[in-house]
Amino acid sequence: MCRPLVTLLAILLGLAAHAGAQDLTLQEIILRAKPAVAVVVAEVGGQVTLRCGGVEKTVSPVPYRESGSGFFLSPRGWLVTNGHVVVVAQEPPRRWMTAHLVEKAFRAECLPGLLTRRGLAPGERPEVEDGLVREAVAATPADRVTLEPTVSVILQNGARLAARIAKYSAPARGEGMSGRDLALLRVEASDMPTLALGDSGAVKIGDKISVIGFPTVVMTHELLSATAKAQASVTHGSVSSFKQDRANQPVIQTDAAAEAGTSGGPALNADGAVVGVMTFVTQGDGGAVQGFNFVIPSAAVRDFLSGTTVALDETSRFNAAWHAGLADFFSGSYSRAARPLAEANRLLPEVPDVLRITAEAMARAKTQPLLPWGQVGGALVLAGFAGYGVLLWRRRQRNLFRISPSEVARLLEGTEPPAILDVRETTAYERSPVRIPRSLRVTLGDLDDGGKRPAVDQKRLVVAYCT
């Protein structure tokens, strides 16, 4: 293959790869986004000192827990979620929480012994158990209970990181969620996956939207493994309306399915940018009523972040590696995908989607031909057309074209006969009995050397005979 054709093939293949990289599928958009979404857990634990059968005990009951979703906006560990997801840790309802923890402690440490002394089995007399619990709660003063609120973030590789609440906007009191129900969390981490904030002002009714989060119904499903529960779920829908909450603040209505636990998760547009944060769902007698869920616009998130040190334009090294690996994978360059995918796994180990795509790329690379023949074939066809076009262009530039012997004979009989040059090789000329009448004998070597030039009017048509 000649060098110009090789160069042309390289250019065509490069252009094809570049065009493919700009056209992301929904699958690739979702895979890019998922690692940046995490579980947010708010807990209130503590220590309860109470009397069990005349003996004083200090008990650490099972903490009260609320969970939701959140997503990283900065590789330095800044994460956004809903305010109501972390409200129990930010503003613990002390009276209710104290009674809750006392009950938990009493049922775990004191109740079994009291029932045994009364000759009762657990669950045999529920009304007796409830009465004993009420007595214990009433007899335990609040100063015997120490509350310990905490917030943590669980990544999709199962890692649990302690978090602090850096900024908080409470939901509207007594009137459900407000639409400015936001919290900014910080974990001690670097190279986190991130999502970019989009322009909620550009969102239109009918636009496609994808919501990523951790619905409780999936997190608590008895048929799923612990690894499966740690992976985010994705639902799809459209923007159905623009409304205002009770505080007259704008919210976006969507028919994308959402459940408890999805709160705080990102709502993505068709480009994978965050245009909102899932905030509340419509509840009916049987649970959430799907098709009527609401999203805080990303413009409100930007306003909420003002005055903080969150850098929204900071590059995530994980994103760079993960996105490059996905681009190679979806373009069919499975072997080339290995390096960026390995880098993504090094920066954030054991993310299920990274492991799955890596394994699939390795399997496909083993059965992939050395060259992408589909692309090569297409490029060769394009190169053929391009080469033919170049040839025609060069001939037109040089006024060169082929004519048949019969056409030459016709021209010789015309009023302006052409000049005939016999440019056959010397050996061929000497061996051949063919001689062309009124032709001029000259070799190509003579023409190239610039020595022997035929005396021909440049305005005349020149026919060269070389076969």
Range-by-range predicted roles:
Residues 352-374:
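Short, aromatic-rich amphipathic segments at membrane interfaces
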Residues 451-467:
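Catalytic cysteine-centered active loop of the rhodanese-like fold, especially the PTP/DSP P-loop
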Residues 369-433:
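Flexible, polar/low-complexity N-terminal or interdomain linker segments that lie immediately upstream
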Residues 21-82, 180-183, 194:
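N-terminal activation segment of mature serine protease catalytic domains
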Residues 74-170:
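Catalytic-histidine neighborhood of serine endopeptidases
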